[in-house]
């Protein structure tokens, strides 16, 4: 619980919080209704939405750029992501987007950045769930899928319920690279995106100028990035799907 102290502080919860490593006997047990959770519960109960949105919005004033890219590029190698996210960062930074790595900031700074943003681009991930509590009404959210099994429906349900907006979902996945004993794309997998198509999609959506020419890695550079990731994680990757062996041979 100690690692969550900043979040509880942002919520204005100052009661002592204790955890127990062994079973306990209590005189009275209060089990509240689950206000938020999986599937349909991503919409949140009305009471939960009011509480979370009001408390977190009060934790920090808006501070930051009105165009924000939420990045996973500096997360540990064991966490999932996409190849060449740094290229996405660099090109969006050229266009004036603030590149934000939320795990490097306290929750109050994260809230301040999200409250200031009118346009957010991000890979699917937990940072988008926090942003849904505090983004301004009318904000534009673009979610890039990083894995083919990402449940975009959950994010859409949350944003429609909390903010009345529908995130745009961009699916330009070429391959899911999986490791270990994984049989499907999961939180550890790495997506290989069709980067030219990604930026063409941004142009069609009006997120970037149509005459913008992105600087993108070629196939050789992408394979070098994949090898670097293999080295850092200490395990081989394979492409999910029937063409895995052929693709790995080409990558080698």
Q: For the regions a protein language model found, what residue spans apply to each?
A:
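The feature primarily captures lumenal catalytic ectodomains
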Residues: 1-252
């Amino acid at each position: 619980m100690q690692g969550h102290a900043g979040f509880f502080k942002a919520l204005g919860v100052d009661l002592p919080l204790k955890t127990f490593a062994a079973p306990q006997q209590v005189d009275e047990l209060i089990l509240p209704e689950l206000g938020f959770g999986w599937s349909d519960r991503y919409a949140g109960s009305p009471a939960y939405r009011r509480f979370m949105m009001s408390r977190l919005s009060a934790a920090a004033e808006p501070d930051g750029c009105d165009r924000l890219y939420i990045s996973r590029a500096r997360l540990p190698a064991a966490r999932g992501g996409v190849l060449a996210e740094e290229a996405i960062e660099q090109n969006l930074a050229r266009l004036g987007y603030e590149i934000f790595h939320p795990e490097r900031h306290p929750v109050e700074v994260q809230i301040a950045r999200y409250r200031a943003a009118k346009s957010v681009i991000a890979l699917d991930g937990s940072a988008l769930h926090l942003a849904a509590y505090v983004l301004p009404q009318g904000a534009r959210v673009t979610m890039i899928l990083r894995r083919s099994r990402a449940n975009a429906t959950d994010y859409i349900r949350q944003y429609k319920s909390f903010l009345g907006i529908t995130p745009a979902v961009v699916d330009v996945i070429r391959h899911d690279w999986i490791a270990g004993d994984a049989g499907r794309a999961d939180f550890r997998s790495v997506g290989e995106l069709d980067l030219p198509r990604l930026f063409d999609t941004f142009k069609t959506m009006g997120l970037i100028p149509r005459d913008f020419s992105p600087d993108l890695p070629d196939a050789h550079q992408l394979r070098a990035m994949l090898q670097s990731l293999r080295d850092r994680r200490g395990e081989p990757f394979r492409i999910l799907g029937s063409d895995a062996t052929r693709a790995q041979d080409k990558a080698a």
